[in-house]
């Protein structure tokens, strides 16, 4: 297919652009295979470049011969184009709808993007499982790398290389994979160097109504226990949902077969419940005419902060088991690709200072989201505005980022990255020039040859010029475990995501700049003080002689 076939009218003059916090701009609208571009006729610097893949929905309106297209973006922005001529307007709308809903992944922009910057580091090779294993192997010899999934035949949603107990061989892993949903046998997610406890993750066991068991599975997870110690099985589904799963061949670990493990059920919502929650929240945030009662009522009715609370509570529970109880943890829901990853990731941010650095957080996303098989292509296919909903779309990753922001807000000096870093990750998960978030798992990315044909997001982010934008000026390395509050009054709406297009951030930006300047000035003064102290010490030494 040629993009030209979908572009009926490639250029229209005298188009007026309306967008939040900008004055209206009149200019020339151009459509390319991947971008909608509007250039001002008065000011050459005034330009809008919008990826078609960032468009969630469009509305059309006509008054006489003047047409209006309202574009609703996946990053929650809403822009308006006033186009002279009904035919031109209909053609532009038709082209945008076609170009923003391309079926083939290989037609997406990352396959056509050619970076204008020098690649200092290839992000595709920055965070490999072998590197993570090396980090842990200095503290323990009880684990090994397994390449059993090197051709993705055991588990299509796992990477080729995983970390498993050394006492369990690959033949046993095959049997365990057959006993777990999607072949997702328990693998190491995190090793707590302080006491040797671990977090493992998997899919649900396929016990069914007959209570099927797998002795190799029991041996595998028992291999993580110390003598006389119990472990915790955290199921991210309610007991009722887990019991219903047995009728479909799924289920949960039977106490009789896992006597050393205590099972805890939490209730983290999935799929359409989360999607509906996002739709209600964005709708409430976009409505400018609410009185206080109506606004608070709509915010509460969205249940967004309730989902945040449930996820953070479960992550804190997992971290508590590891650090305070001295017990290992296995976490799963149904597939083990959504709520499971939210919990394992957030538990590591609580426990592990490395995950609160920029590179450590990037490694966490690679390891616990991309390599762990979170289906980004499906979950982020649409955002809050699209009417043609599919059952697999859900803001799982956005909820995770929101949870991280809640912790960052409570511990503003413990994170090397800032809020802009989290917002950037949200934007690129939904629409990007980079290939990092394409595909649903490593198997699909391998077939698409993303490493050879697209650029990694990390290659761009980790350049010194870009990193400075995402660095927290308040950061001071904190090697302690951090315990966020999950009390309702401690959780807030993330304005930087949900209100950034409905109210100006000008004064907040100015205050942030002023804070950065004060911190820099303070560092300069501290450096001068240190020099003067050294000089004073030298003079005192000379006088003593």
Swiss-Prot record:
GO molecular function (one): enzyme regulator activity
Cellular localisation: Cytoplasm; Cell projection, Ruffle membrane; Cytoplasm, Perinuclear region; Endoplasmic reticulum
GO biological process: endocytosis; negative regulation of autophagy; protein stabilization; regulation of phosphatidylinositol dephosphorylation
UniProt-listed CDD domains: PH-GRAM_MTMR9, PTP-MTMR9
Highest taxon of source: Eukaryota
One Gene Ontology term, aspect cellular component: cytosol
Topological relation to the membrane, as annotated: Peripheral membrane protein
InterPro entries: Myotubularin, Myotubularin-like_Pase_dom, PH-like_dom_sf, Prot-tyrosine_phosphatase-like
Domain GRAM: 4-99
Main location: cytoplasm
Residue(s) carrying N-acetylmethionine: 1
UniProt keyword list: Acetylation, Cell membrane, Cell projection, Coiled coil, Cytoplasm, Endocytosis, Endoplasmic reticulum, Membrane
A Pfam family of this chain: PH-GRAM_MTMR6-like
Positions of the Myotubularin phosphatase domain: 123-498
Record text about domains: The GRAM domain is required for cell membrane localization. The coiled coil domain mediates interaction with MTMR9.
Subunit structure, as described in the record: Homodimer. Heterodimer (via C-terminus) with lipid phosphatase MTMR6 (via C-terminus). Heterodimer (via coiled coil domain) with lipid phosphatase MTMR7 (via C-terminus).
Function: Acts as an adapter for myotubularin-related phosphatases. Increases lipid phosphatase MTMR6 catalytic activity, specifically towards phosphatidylinositol 3,5-bisphosphate, and MTMR6 binding affinity for phosphorylated phosphatidylinositols. Positively regulates lipid phosphatase MTMR7 catalytic activity. The formation of the MTMR6-MTMR9 complex, stabilizes both MTMR6 and MTMR9 protein levels. Plays a role in the late stages of macropinocytosis possibly by regulating MTMR6-mediated dephosphorylation of phosphatidylinositol 3-phosphate in membrane ruffles.
Listed name of the protein: Myotubularin-related protein 9
Organism: Mus musculus
């Amino acid at each position: 297919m040629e993009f030209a076939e979908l572009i009926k009218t490639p250029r229209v003059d005298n188009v007026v652009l309306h967008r939040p916090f900008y004055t209206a701009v009149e200019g020339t609208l151009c459509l390319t295979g991947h971008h909608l571009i509007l250039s001002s006729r008065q000011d050459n610097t005034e330009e809008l470049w919008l990826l078609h893949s960032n468009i969630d929905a469009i509305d059309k309106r006509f008054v006489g011969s003047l047409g209006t297209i309202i574009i609703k973006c996946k990053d929650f922005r809403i822009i308006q184009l006033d186009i002279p001529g009904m035919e031109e307007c209909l053609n532009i709308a038709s082209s945008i709808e076609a170009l923003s809903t391309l079926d083939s992944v290989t037609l997406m922009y990352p396959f056509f993007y050619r970076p204008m910057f020098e690649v200092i580091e290839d992000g595709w090779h920055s965070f490999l499982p072998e590197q993570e294993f090396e980090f842990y192997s200095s503290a323990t010899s009880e684990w090994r790398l397994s390449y059993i999934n090197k051709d993705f035949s055991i588990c299509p949603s796992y990477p080729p290389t995983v970390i498993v107990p050394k006492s369990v061989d690959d033949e046993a892993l095959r049997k365990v994979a057959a006993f777990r949903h999607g072949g997702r046998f328990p693998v190491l997610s995190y090793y707590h160097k302080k006491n040797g406890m671990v977090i493992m993750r998997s899919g649900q066991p396929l016990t069914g109504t007959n209570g099927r068991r797998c002795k190799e599975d029991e041996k595998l997870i028992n291999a993580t226990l110390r003598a006389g110690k119990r472990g915790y099985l955290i199921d991210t589904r309610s007991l009722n949902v887990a019991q219903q799963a047995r009728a479909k061949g799924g289920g949960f670990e039977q106490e009789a077969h896992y006597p050393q493990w205590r099972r805890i059920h939490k209730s983290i919502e999935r799929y359409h419940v989360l999607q509906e929650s996002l739709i209600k929240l964005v709708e409430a945030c976009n409505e400018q005419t609410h009185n206080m009662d109506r606004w608070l009522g709509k915010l509460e009715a969205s249940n967004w902060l309730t989902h945040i609370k449930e996820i953070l509570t479960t992550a804190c529970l997992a971290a508590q088991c590891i650090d305070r109880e001295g017990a290992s943890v296995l976490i799963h829901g149904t597939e083990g690709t959504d709520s499971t990853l939210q919990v394992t990731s957030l538990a590591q941010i609580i426990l592990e200072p490395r995950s609160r650095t920029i590179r450590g957080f990037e490694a966490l996303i690679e390891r616990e989201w991309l390599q762990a098989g979170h289906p980004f292509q499906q979950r982020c296919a649409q955002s809050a505005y699209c009417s043609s909903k599919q059952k697999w779309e859900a803001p799982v990753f956005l909820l995770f980022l929101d949870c991280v922001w809640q912790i960052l807000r409570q511990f503003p000096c413990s994170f090397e990255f800032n809020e802009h870093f989290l917002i950037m990750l949200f934007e690129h998960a939904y629409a990007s020039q980079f290939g990092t978030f394409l595909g649903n798992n490593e198997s699909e990315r391998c077939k698409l040859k993303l490493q050879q044909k697209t650029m990694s997001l990390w290659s761009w982010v980790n350049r010194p010029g870009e990193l400075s934008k995402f660095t927290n000026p308040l950061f001071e390395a904190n090697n302690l475990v951090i315990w966020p509050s999950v009390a309702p009054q401690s959780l807030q709406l993330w304005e930087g995501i949900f209100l950034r297009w409905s109210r100006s951030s000008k004064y907040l930006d100015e205050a942030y700049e002023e804070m950065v300047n004060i911190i820099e000035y303070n560092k300069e003064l501290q450096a001068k003080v240190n020099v003067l102290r050294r000089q004073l010490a030298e003079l005192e030494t000379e006088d003593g002689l």
